[in-house]
Amino acid sequence: MDNLLKDMGKRIFDRRKQLNMTQETLAELAHVTPQTISTAELGQKAMRPETILKVCDALHISTEYLLRGVITEA
């Protein structure tokens, strides 16, 4: 599970940087705390399912990409 959390965290971090967002901006857009974003990016704590959905929406990525690194075509 640790590798999954670290991989998810890296995908969040990379996408956030790609969008030129701060952790604070992402937190505002996802309606979560900056601490939630920080711990997720570091792979320190699993996110709740509803938080995953909000973060994915804010980053304009699919849950499949966040969880598995798979890019799906629309």
PLM features per residue range, with description:
Residues 57, 67-74:
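Short, charged recognition helix plus adjacent turn
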Residues 17, 28, 57:
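Alpha-helical residues within the helix-turn-helix
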Residues 15, 29, 40, 69:
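Residues in the recognition helix of alpha-helical DNA-binding motifs
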Residues 50-65:
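DNA major-groove recognition helix of helix-turn-helix/homeodomain DNA-binding modules
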Residues 20-39:
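Short alpha-helical DNA-recognition segment
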Residues 1-18:
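A short, Lys/Arg-rich alpha-helix, primarily the initiator
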